[in-house]
């Protein structure tokens, strides 16, 4: 099964996510997303970056956060997701050694 990755130019990315080029420059500078490729004169973004930016835009509208606040919130949300996954895996490993009533 082949993986397909959709890529966007800056203009396509901004149209797809609803952000301006200035906002895109700011969130790239904050590390919210990174270009998949840096071509000679432009950036190219993948579909994962579009999902992250759409999530960021939702946070901006729902919580009225600025872009630096959104960068922190997304980092914390990702950390929580990783910790939950690690906790789930550790519980599964522990359950092998603990007798269930």
Curated annotation (Swiss-Prot):
Domain of life: Bacteria
InterPro entries membership: CbpM
Entry's Gene Ontology molecular function annotations: enzyme inhibitor activity
Induction: In late stationary phase.
Family statement drawn from the similarity comment of this UniProt entry: Belongs to the CbpM family.
NCBIfam families, per the entry: PRK10265.1
Function: Interacts with CbpA and inhibits both the DnaJ-like co-chaperone activity and the DNA binding activity of CbpA. Together with CbpA, modulates the activity of the DnaK chaperone system. Does not inhibit the co-chaperone activity of DnaJ.
Protein name: Chaperone modulatory protein CbpM
């Amino acid at each position: 099964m082949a993986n397909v990755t959709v890529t966007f130019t800056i203009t396509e990315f901004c149209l797809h996510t609803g952000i301006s080029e200035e906002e895109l420059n700011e969130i790239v500078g904050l590390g919210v997303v990174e270009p998949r490729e840096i071509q000679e004169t432009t950036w190219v973004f993948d579909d994962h970056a579009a999902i992250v930016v759409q999530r960021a835009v939702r946070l901006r509208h729902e919580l009225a956060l600025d872009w630096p606040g959104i960068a922190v919130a997304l980092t914390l949300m990702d950390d929580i997701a990783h910790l939950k996954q690690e906790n789930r895996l550790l519980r599964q490993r522990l359950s092998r050694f603990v007798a269930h009533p």
